[in-house]
Amino acid sequence: MSFELELKRIRDEIVQNLPPEITVTKIEFEGPEIAVYSESEDVAAIETSSTLKDLAKVMRKRVVFRWNVDKRKDPAETKDYIMNLISKDAEIGEITFDHTRGEVIIESGKPGLVIGKKGINLKEIRTNTFWQPKTIRTPPLPSRTIQLIRGMLKKERQTQKDILLEIGKRIHRPALFNNLNIRMNALGGFREVGRSCILMQTRDSNVLLDVGLNVGNPNDRFPYFFVPQFSIRDLDAVIISHSHLDHCGVVPFLYKYGYRGPIYCTLPTRNLSTMLQLDFIQICDKEGTPSPYSKRDVKNAVLHTIPLSWGKVTDIAPDIKLTLHNSGHILGSSMIHLHFGKGDYNFVYTGDFKYQKTRLLEKATVKFPRVEGLLIEATYGGPQDRIPSRQESEKELKQILNSTLKRGGKVLIPVLAVGRAQELLIVLEEYISSGFIDKVPVYIDGLISEATAIHTANPDFLSSDLREKILHQGKNPFLSDFFETVSSQDERADIIGGGPCIILATSGMLIGGPSVHYLKALAEDSKNTLIFVSYQVSGTLGSRIIRGFREFNYIDWKGRTQLVKIGLKVFTLEGFSGHSSRSQISQFLRRIQPRPKVVIVNHGEESKCVSLSTMIHKKLRKSTKSPKNLEVVLLK
């Protein structure tokens, strides 16, 4: 069956299932959505919930209604109508119009007031203007990344519409084969931590799960793209579990070499990935090393990204449906559920996950519609990986901070910009405001402030407790006056020469960035303290210090090398990790519903992957595999 015949079949099915008073003028595949255009003014009939639900149930596809251009109200009149309808308490900012898709985009500090109780305001806007309203949140902290992305999408709306139409054609093409064979190709991140990349293949489709960098080994950065089964031309989709560079850092590289398909991830993951990819280009420029991609490639990736909410079933290929679920690792991080064929096989990729609620995030999901195969991480999957509880680690952190500050020292905490940084900001705000530690400056350096601004724009992805504080109690710990952002070398010099303080700086593994600069300045003074709170990839300076190395070579901006002795105190607080411990992995596997038939282990040092795989097989009586990079696993 050709694409045109498939389009006609779907159109006929939609018309048959709509009320007779609704006139359909055009149907388009906009990416995974079917856009139905109408000239009917009887919006109430279209808005009837049973009609939409019944249609989606029959079609098994996402359907959105739009009105013809000549039916839409004048933009100026529509804007006036919205401003008169919505309370001033909603803090409406810019109102813009996407003429290519018939949407009015309303930016607001309080989107809930724009939406109204049970969506009443959105319904009023649709009924009276024939525009589809869409709300976006104004970040309480200004974000350069969000501003850049929103400006780009506003400028390139026709380009994005054209991209969606092309993606839609590929998604909704007829499947050629009835017999479903599924292969999982290990292209990176197997028996190692870094460059996560999994190629899922059927006879009809090719989908990549994560495309990451090897951050600990700049000489071997990329996944194994050279294998014969991988072809950029044949890729149907790329799905990103979360925004850390070892999972998303190579995405723009695909567009540099011809990929023109979609990226699926959550909205926070898109924004944070863009921030980190642009920063990676900057770091390469500063270090004088060639970047594997350009800002243009990052822009291309943004234009091809289709953000998804958790729990929303989405067609991504003729024989694959995707659903994202919370993984509890960092903001917007997701477990990836793939539904193959007509229920023939269901596969879950956990990505990095945390099966424990934290101050920042809810714990990972354990309930899925169906699961036959599970791919799970083993970062802390070794028998020796007994991570202390979060409460124990917070208590120890408090003691370390107090002892360091009382002896007049400074505390350096290297952190990844996304995840542990925000968790620590919440803890430190409570410690200082409650008087648990002395009121000293808390300096934030590197990308932390920008990443935190993106967190403030996405409260719906935060833990229920934190969301309640921010949205309903007006208490946002990220806006605390205790935190001071550092933005220049002069400010860093003042901090180093100043009194007791706490410094949060990137990078978390001491592979570059201001954290290395601070370490060089503070390292030899025994009054100071260095605290690690996140996983240190093998080969990084952070990993070497944890293993007992007490000196390192520091290269200054002129390229001169200096040997630095480490005399400060060093602590590791693994309880703040965003990864699950071995016991938490076991709990997850005992509680996941339904139980998978086969469990595959990745994302861990070789010994940990093998050990975890063996434990799961023996104790949980599951068929397990711990493949190496380049191995292929036949799932069905």
Curated annotation (Swiss-Prot):
InterPro entries: aCPSF1, Beta_Casp, KH_dom, KH_dom-like_a/b, KH_dom_type_2, MBL, Metallo-B-lactamas, RibonucZ/Hydroxyglut_hydro. Zn(2+) 2 binds at D246, H247, D352, H603. Pfam families: Beta-Casp, KH_2, KH_TffA, Lactamase_B_6, RMMBL. One of its GO terms (biological process) is DNA-templated transcription termination. Residues 578-636 are annotated as: Metallo-beta-lactamase C-terminus. PROSITE patterns: KH_TYPE_1. Its cofactor is Zn(2+). Residues 384-577 are annotated as: Beta-Casp. Residues 4-72 are annotated as: KHa. It comes from the Archaea. PANTHER family: CLEAVAGE AND POLYADENYLATION SPECIFICITY FACTOR, CLEAVAGE AND POLYADENYLATION SPECIFICITY FACTOR FAMILY MEMBER. This is Transcription termination factor FttA.
